[in-house]
């Protein structure tokens, strides 16, 4: 399969301006493609990963990958369909640029990937040059018809955000000129901005100039919910914001209805292996082979091979109940979402400890559960109602992990 056929098979192609022309350009020599991202946060999230996966596929097909960090456009803000964006300070933008640049460098490595900042050219552009050299080439009538602009006409859109499509068009032309970039890749909401850039290139370089655009479908799960969040929280690529274990678990917990689609979209596995995994989902869903492979592949791409091993080792320890040897960081990672309570850093009788922490509703119930072997502290079963709990004995004195029954966990956080 060629690059476009592969995208179609994976369900990763929404619109394309000139399929035959792009394939012809790719066959005639090495051409560049780019994805742009504005530093509106200090980390990328899963929504950003989608166009980067397509760019990586383009690179694997023999193309040159270019990534724009929007140092200039990030100061403006890509218009949203509903409300105006809050402008970020220059200090915050600089900090965000630093974090995102490090992330895309890690994703793409050093193999023929160019990472550029559009402040290098937009930052040098005077207002007069902007209006004279570019403003004259954009029709207000056409700009007003772009989907995101049209959706804001009733509620209002600032001139700042209205001109964003011009700036993105300039980006495409600059990369066309500087880096031999012929293709822009973006989400489905970027179609209008991408075609504006192609029109600008044709206006400046002639209608024969080769410039193409493709967009990716909006990713949703089988229920129609927008993809990329877990219990309402964004899944970040920064390991400090979403740990590799949580990231791994997000993929491992995907349902049978979605996992094959995500294997096509988010991994570089071939059709034969994905077909085999789809067969496993159909014939033996309880084994969850497809989900495990999905978690392994995406975690490896984002965080590296060692992160996969650490996540799987932690999963094994949790499944077996062997939590005594885990580090404080692993405990915080794995049990950050369970009910928690504050605990004093003093030795306390187990019955009092359980009641004071809200693990048990009464001392009678606490004594009964302890005597029946239903309580484990830091991975060790406690059956003596006279036992004393030393909060500083495990996990660097930061936590006490309580399990009631087979699956109910509570995390005591030491004051």
Curated annotation (Swiss-Prot):
Single annotated GO MF: ATP binding
Alphabetical keyword list: Aminoacyl-tRNA synthetase, ATP-binding, Cytoplasm, Ligase, Nucleotide-binding, Protein biosynthesis, RNA-binding
PROSITE patterns xref list: AA_TRNA_LIGASE_I (PS00178), S4 (PS50889)
Binding site for ATP: 229
Cross-referenced SUPFAM superfamilies: Alpha-L RNA-binding motif, Nucleotidylyl transferase
Sequence motif 'KMSKS' region, location on chain: 226-230
Record EC number: 6.1.1.1
Domain S4 RNA-binding intervals: 348-415
Source taxon at top rank: Bacteria
Membrane spanning stretches: none
GO biological process, one term: tyrosyl-tRNA aminoacylation
GO-annotated cellular components: cytosol
Catalytic reaction annotation: tRNA(Tyr) + L-tyrosine + ATP = L-tyrosyl-tRNA(Tyr) + AMP + diphosphate + H(+)
CDD domains: S4, TyrRS_core
Binding site for L-tyrosine: 34, 164, 168
Subcellular location: Cytoplasm
Enzyme class: ligase
Pfam families named among the record's database cross-references: SYY_C-terminal, tRNA-synt_1b
Sequence motif: 'HIGH' region, positions: 39-48
Main function: Catalyzes the attachment of tyrosine to tRNA(Tyr) in a two-step reaction: tyrosine is first activated by ATP to form Tyr-AMP and then transferred to the acceptor end of tRNA(Tyr).
UniProt record similarity statement: Belongs to the class-I aminoacyl-tRNA synthetase family. TyrS type 1 subfamily.
Subunit description: Homodimer.
Protein name according to UniProt: Tyrosine--tRNA ligase
């Amino acid at each position: 399969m060629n690059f476009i056929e592969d995208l179609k098979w994976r369900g990763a192609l929404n619109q394309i301006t000139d399929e035959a022309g792009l394939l012809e350009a790719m066959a005639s020599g090495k051409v560049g493609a780019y994805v742009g991202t504005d530093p509106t946060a200090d980390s990328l999230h899963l929504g950003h990963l989608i166009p980067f996966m397509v760019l990586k596929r383009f690179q694997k097909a023999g193309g040159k990958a270019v990534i724009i960090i929007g140092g200039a456009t990030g100061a403006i803000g890509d218009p949203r369909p509903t409300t105006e964006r809050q402008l970020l300070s220059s200090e915050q933008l600089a900090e965000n640029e630093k974090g995102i640049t490090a992330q895309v460098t890690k994703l793409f490595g050093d193999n023929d990937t160019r990472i550029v900042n559009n402040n290098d050219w937009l930052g040098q552009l005077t207002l007069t040059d902007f209006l004279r050299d570019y403003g004259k080439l954009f029709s207000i009538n056409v700009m007003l018809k772009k989907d995101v602009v049209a959706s804001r006409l009733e509620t209002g859109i600032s001139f700042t955000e209205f001109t964003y499509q011009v700036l993105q068009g300039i980006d495409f032309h600059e990369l066309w000129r500087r880096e031999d970039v012929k293709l822009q890749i973006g989400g489905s909401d970027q179609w209008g901005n991408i075609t504006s850039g192609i029109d600008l290139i044709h206006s400046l370089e002639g209608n024969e100039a080769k410039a193409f655009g493709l967009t990716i479908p909006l990713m949703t799960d089988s229920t129609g919910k927008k993809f990329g969040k877990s219990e309402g929280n964004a899944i970040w690529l920064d390991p400090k914001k979403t740990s590799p274990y949580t990231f791994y678990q997000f993929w491992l917990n995907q349902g049978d209805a979605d996992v094959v689609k995500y294997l096509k979209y988010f991994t570089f596995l071939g059709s034969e292996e994905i077909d085999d995994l789809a067969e496993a989902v159909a014939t033996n869903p309880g084994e969850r082979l497809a989900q495990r492979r999905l978690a392994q592949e995406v975690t490896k791409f984002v965080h590296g091979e060692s992160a996969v091993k650490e996540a799987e080792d932690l999963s094994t320890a949790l499944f077996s109940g062997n939590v005594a040897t885990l580090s404080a960081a692993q405990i915080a990672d794995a049990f950050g979402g369970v009910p928690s309570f504050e605990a004093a850093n003093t030795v306390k009788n187990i019955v009092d400890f359980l009641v004071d922490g809200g693990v048990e509703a009464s001392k009678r119930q606490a004594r009964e559960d302890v005597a029946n072997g239903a309580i484990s502290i830091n991975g060790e079963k406690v059956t003596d109602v006279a036992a004393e709990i030393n909060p500083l004995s495990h996990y660097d004195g930061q936590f006490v992990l309580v399990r009631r029954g087979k699956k109910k966990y509570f995390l005591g956080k030491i004051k």
